[in-house]
Structure formats: C-alpha cells, structure tokens
C-alpha cells in the first residue's frame, strides 16, 4: 500500500475512527455499613438525680437527705481539695488500698494457655485453701444446675467451671480483701454494699463486654475493680481526722456528683498501674481521666452499662420484676436479661 493511495480522498474512503476501548469500570465501593445499633443502649442513659442520690445513699450506707441544707458548706469544699491532693499524690494513694496482689501471675499465665492441664492447675490451686474453697463452690453451683451426681474433687471442679470460671474464682479470692474494712467508719459501714455492687457489675460486665467484642474476663475485672474507687474514696475521707462530716453532708445532691467524679479518678490512678491486661489498663486510664459518663471505648461502654444495671438492681423494691425497673427491658439482649434476673433473684 502506497502512501499516495492511503491519503487520496477519491480512491479510498476514510474509515470512521474506531471507538476507543472501553475503560474498565472501577469496582463499585461497598456502601458504608452503619454500626449495628446497641440493643442495650437504653440502659446507657445517666441515672436521674433522684436515682443517683438514692443509689449513693444505698452503697455508702448513709441516710437519705430529704432535709439536707441548701448549701453543702465550706467543709465540703475543703474535703474536695483534700481529696484532690490525695488523687495527685502517689504516696497518699498508696495508703488507701493494698498493693496489687502478685501471688498468682504464673497461674494466670497458665490459664491463658489453651492447652492447660486441669491437673496442673488443680495442683497450683491446692496450695491456697481459700482459693480451693472458691473453685469448688463455683463448681458445686454448676453441678447443682445439672444432672451429674458424681463427687466433685478439685481437679474435676477445675474442669467443670472452665477457664472463665477459674479466672473469676481467682479474681474473687485475690481481690475481695481489698474491699474489706472494719470499725465504725464510712468505709467499714459501706464495705458490704460496695462488694455486692462490685460483684453485680462484674457479672454484668462480663456479659456486656462480650457483646462489645471484648474478652468477658476483662469485663469482669473492670466491673469488679471499678468499686475500688469507692473504697479508696471513703478510706481517704476516714483519714481526714480534722474534717468533721456527716453522712447527710456527703449525700447532698450537689456533693454526690463531685464524689463520684473523684471515685473514678481514684479508680484510674490506683488500678491502672497494676497491669492486669491492656484493655483493663486502658479503661482505668479512660475512666480516671474522663469519668464513667464520658467513656467511649468498648470496654468503657460495657462498664457503664453494667454500672447502670447494677444500680437498678440495688434500687429495685422487693418483689418488683425487672421489666418495671429497667428502662426498655424488652429491648435488652437475652443474655443480659438472664444475667440481671439471676442477680435480682440472689
């Protein structure tokens, strides 16, 4: 083919330009998926002022404040200043709670191993009489719900309650002494209620944590240990011998929120350094810095919801069903309902 023939307009028609090759369409981006609605969000709302004050009076074992003065007075302002001093001082904080127990780190590491031997764990547990009793008690509770009529020894108890049950039994035994107090002081009078509430929060926290994608045991520990803030707060107040305070002054509607914020700060300052697990350390720092009402982490949300539900449980009149006392009860997940109902029946 000559160049002349190619270009001569009378001897060859110009062919229409070929259509450009189609450009491959970019793969369609999936539409953003909205986060699933939290079915337990109804219990995430703050307690009313009346509920909050009633719960404070229950857990701290002080009388209701129907005849409280309009102003809490300068003594309370001085109290807050002293509490802030304690919160900011590692030396002063160290006097409020026993040091974090380190007697069982090897056992805890063993329990995190999927291939742990129940016999090996039983041998370790058998060295502690109190822990042995707690493990067998937990297994007996499981046994009573089943049809097995065999005898429960320690090795069998370890197998029956499983890893999560063991961790909880160990946590209860090791951490319970932190909440104990004696004498006629604010902390001593409140000790039983603080522990009862901590146990409720721990059990609820384990269930709620799993629904927020968090290890249930981290939820259990966070719920159990959050109340160390109450214990530390009241022990600090007990130690202020130069400040004369009544329960009515502590339970004043303007004082309770200030005390609760300092409870959270003490929880963060005391529990954070214990290095129990990364999620627990992080939630302790978050609660300590922001307060329980402002947390955003998954474990923080589980802890806050557990705290709300535990408060409803404490405030429920005898004989009242959960549907009457818990907001939007029917919307809660079945596992949360079951856990709450079990606590209410105890």
Per-region residue spans from a language model:
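Catalytic or ion-translocation cores adjacent to nucleophile or general acid/base/metal-coordination motifs
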Residues: 243-245
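Conserved alpha-helical "signature site"
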Residues: 2-225, 230-239, 250-346
């Amino acid at each position: 083919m000559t160049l002349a023939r190619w270009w001569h307009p009378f001897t060859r028609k110009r062919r229409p330009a070929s259509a450009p090759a189609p450009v491959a369409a970019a793969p369609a981006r999936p539409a953003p998926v909205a986060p699933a609605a939290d079915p337990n969000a109804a219990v995430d709302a703050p307690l009313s002022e009346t509920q909050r004050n009633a719960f404070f009076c229950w857990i701290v074992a002080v009388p209701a404040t129907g005849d409280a003065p309009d102003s809490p007075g300068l003594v309370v302002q001085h109290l807050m200043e002293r509490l802030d001093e304690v919160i900011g001082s590692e030396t002063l904080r160290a006097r409020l709670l026993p040091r974090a127990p380190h007697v069982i780190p090897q056992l805890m590491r063993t329990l995190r191993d999927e291939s742990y031997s129940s016999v090996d764990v039983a041998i370790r547990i058998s060295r502690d009489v109190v822990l042995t009793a707690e493990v067998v008690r937990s297994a007996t509770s499981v046994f009573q719900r089943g049809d097995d009529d065999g005898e429960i020894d320690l090795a069998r108890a370890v197998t029956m309650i499983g890893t999560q049950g063991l961790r909880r039994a160990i946590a209860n035994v090791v951490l319970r002494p932190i909440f104990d107090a004696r004498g006629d002081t604010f902390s001593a009078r409140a000790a039983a209620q603080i522990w009862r509430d901590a146990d409720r929060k721990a059990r609820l926290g384990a269930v709620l944590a799993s629904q927020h994608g968090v290890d249930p045991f981290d939820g259990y520990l966070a719920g159990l240990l959050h109340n160390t803030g109450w214990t530390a707060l009241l022990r600090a107040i007990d130690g202020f011998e130069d400040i004369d305070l009544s329960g009515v002054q502590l339970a004043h509607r303007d004082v309770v929120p200030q005390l609760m914020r300092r409870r959270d700060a003490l929880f963060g300052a005391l529990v954070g350094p214990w290095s129990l697990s990364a999620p627990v350390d992080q939630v302790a720092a978050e609660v300590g810095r922001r307060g329980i009402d402002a947390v955003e982490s998954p474990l923080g949300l589980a802890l806050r919801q557990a705290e709300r539900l535990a408060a409803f449980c404490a405030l429920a009149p005898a004989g009242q069903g959960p549907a009457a006392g818990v907001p939007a009860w029917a919307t809660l997940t079945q596992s949360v309902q079951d856990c709450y109902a079990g606590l209410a029946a105890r």
